[in-house]
């Protein structure tokens, strides 16, 4: 979570030097409970710094469910406590993330200050190599894999070849 302090500091230095810069920082839902994250959000809000905070919310801080670690329903609610606007998207939907990030980046570049993007996603594997994931409930991973089987989406036409080609073109650019 310490990179948030760097992002705030970089945007403050850029402002001091007259440079038109923004910073984007990524962190997991577990890191969001570190004091430096909250301090950085407060600093960015007070000084209207163009910092974009992106939390990758997979529901677990290593092995602790967010139900036991976070008192709000959504991380954007926490950001709102600092006066920072935010949006939650399906972090597995490339186009949703791209669209939301584009709007937030535009806002930051226009002097709108900090913003918060919560990307909800699933962690299919453990937090570390060899993690037995005993903290997950019975059948939890099976239900998730059934619900988020991307090969079924491609086969069913929800994600079509043109979409995959468009993603490839964007990544190559």
Residue ranges, per PLM feature:
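Glycine-rich ThDP/TPP pyrophosphate-binding loop and its adjacent helix/strand module
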Residues: 1-173
